[in-house]
């Protein structure tokens, strides 16, 4: 197993190196060629770039756009219509369709509004993002970590931990209110025009920004914002907020930014208040964005949450931990999967739980310790015992299943006829002996969080 995991890690690393080298090559070629930047659309339409974009869109899957075309249909469509698609792009006549509005519930309440482009527009945006990332990424701040090649939320948290370890123990969390919906189009286009000379690319980006949103049967015209859901949106967001990064660097502030999540670390409460006021003013006046004053706050790293983590200091050591709210969110997801009235087989439940737990542990591995992992492992298995018990509604079924697992007839009858609820019984000694924690791992294949520590 370890050999397979190591091979996968090596393959992923090798792929990342190849992609990074290719991007650096493209950036160098465009920078050195006197006509490179005004022929950017030709680079976007190159076969290798388009094939890479197609593979990315297919692997990401995702919901259809307004034309209802699925990602599984995209390759055949592009093969049949590529000559026209390429001609429209090179002549600046491609007309994107409106994005489809989709609401995603937020963890803290409310909804996040997504704009789902058609799969063809996703392909074109992905091809553009690959070339523009090569052109822009090397200019971004080293303290920007979101949606960038070779960077991650875990790296952002490690940088934050280093700040706290160095004595910057007050954090200013700046919350940008509905950032993706309020990006100023003219300011964004001005920023893009500083590095992009190809008017066709600029025109296409402007067309995407103004393509509209289909809500029900009505197309809403938009004059600001870059809808979340398209491959180009994260890069455009980084281009907008790079101006904030440069301002914070110029002031000598210690910060990390992941997409629109900005955290600034200072030494004193007085400095925190001053920084919060001045940075909020810059965001409002210069970037034409809105700061959510209610959610923007000054806190201690071990109290506040950043990207789902918290940073603690104990006995002279600074550590990264999983925030309580992130643990609570995981438990809500597990409860939804193991809800008593779902009527799913144990193998189906295990498959769903494994997908959830692997993703969660992979993300939170920097803050996951053995004590927390062991507690969560036990809690998940207790949920499964309660689920099993609830499926056997008749006492005789419960008794026969207990006996089949080696329980004596006396205790099988005692427990099988009890009126105690499934959750209370799930920690009962008889049930724990019949279906111990390790049974779910060894016999059912349930992921063990402790293995990630």
Stretch-by-stretch model annotation:
Residues 88-103, 107, 131, 139-305:
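Conserved polymerase palm-domain catalytic core
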Residues 73-96:
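Amphipathic alpha-helical blocks
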């Amino acid at each position: 197993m370890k050999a397979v995991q190591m091979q996968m890690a090596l393959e992923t690393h090798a792929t990342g190196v190849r992609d990074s080298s290719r991007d650096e090559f493209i950036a160098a070629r465009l920078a050195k060629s006197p006509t490179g930047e005004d022929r950017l659309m030709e680079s976007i339409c190159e076969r290798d770039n388009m094939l890479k974009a197609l593979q990315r869109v297919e692997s990401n899957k995702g919901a259809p756009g307004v034309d209802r075309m699925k990602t599984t249909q995209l390759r055949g469509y592009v093969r049949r219509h590529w000559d026209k698609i390429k001609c429209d792009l090179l002549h600046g006549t491609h007309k994107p369709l409106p994005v489809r509005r989709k609401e995603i519930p937020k963890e803290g309440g409310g909804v996040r509004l997504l704009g789902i482009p058609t799969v063809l527009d996703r392909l074109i945006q992905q091809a553009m993002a690959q070339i523009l990332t090569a052109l822009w990424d090397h200019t971004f701040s080293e303290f920007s970590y979101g949606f960038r090649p070779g960077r991650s939320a875990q790296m952002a948290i490690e940088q934050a931990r280093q700040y706290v370890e160095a004595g910057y123990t007050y954090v200013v969390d700046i919350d940008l209110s509905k950032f993706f919906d309020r990006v100023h189009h003219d300011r964004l286009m001005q920023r893009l025009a500083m590095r992009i000379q190809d008017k066709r690319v600029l025109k296409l980006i402007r067309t995407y920004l103004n393509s509209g949103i289909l809500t029900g049967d009505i197309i809403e015209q938009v004059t600001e914002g870059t809808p979340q859901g398209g491959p180009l949106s994260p890069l455009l967001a980084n281009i907008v907020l790079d101006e904030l990064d440069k301002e914070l660097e110029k002031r000598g502030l210690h910060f990390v930014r992941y997409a629109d999540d900005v955290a600034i670390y200072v030494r004193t409460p007085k400095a925190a208040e001053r920084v919060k006021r001045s940075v909020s003013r810059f965001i409002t006046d210069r970037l034409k964005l809105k700061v959510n004053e209610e959610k923007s706050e000054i806190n201690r790293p071990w109290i506040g949450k950043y990207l789902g983590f918290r940073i603690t200091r104990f006995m002279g050591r600074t550590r990264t931990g999983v925030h309580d709210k992130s643990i609570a969110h995981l438990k809500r997801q597990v409860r939804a999967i193991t809800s008593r009235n779902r009527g799913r087989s144990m193998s189906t439940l295990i498959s769903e739980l494994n997908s959830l737990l692997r993703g969660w542990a992979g993300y939170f591995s920097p803050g996951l310790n053995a004590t927390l992992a062991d507690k969560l492992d036990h809690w998940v298995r207790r949920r499964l015992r309660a689920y099993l018990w609830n499926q056997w509604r008749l006492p005789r079924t419960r008794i026969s299943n207990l006996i089949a697992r080696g329980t004596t007839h006396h205790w099988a009858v005692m427990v099988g006829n009890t009126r105690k609820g499934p959750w209370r019984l799930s920690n009962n000694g008889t049930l724990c002996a019949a279906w111990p924690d390790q049974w779910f791992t060894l016999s059912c294949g349930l992921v063990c969080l402790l293995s990630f520590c």
